[in-house]
């Protein structure tokens, strides 16, 4: 299994997982604030600030 290992949306750093290695999956992209806060997608946590700036 090959995993991407950087927090950016477009990532080219990979790590080959060894047999039995625990897999951790977290996605974190800054996509907007307040009025532009995106709708949550399945299996995604979206945290937004309450006001701009």
Curated annotation (Swiss-Prot):
InterPro entries found in the cross-reference section: Snake_3FTx, Snake_toxin-like_sf, Snake_toxin_con_site, Toxin_cobra-type
CDD domains on file: TFP_snake_toxin
Assigned keywords, A-Z: Acetylcholine receptor inhibiting toxin, Disulfide bond, Ion channel impairing toxin, Neurotoxin, Postsynaptic neurotoxin, Secreted, Toxin
Lineage: Eukaryota, Metazoa, Chordata, Craniata, Vertebrata
Disulfide linkage: 6-11, 17-33, 37-48
Family membership noted in the UniProt record: Belongs to the three-finger toxin family. Ancestral subfamily. Orphan group II sub-subfamily.
GO MF assignments: acetylcholine receptor inhibitor activity; ion channel regulator activity; toxin activity
PROSITE patterns: SNAKE_TOXIN
Protein name stated in the entry: Weak toxin NWT
Native source organism of the sequence: Naja kaouthia
Known tissue expression: Expressed by the venom gland.
Compartment list: Secreted
Protein's job: Binds with low affinity and weakly inhibits muscle nicotinic acetylcholine receptor (nAChR).
A single GO cellular-component term on record: extracellular region
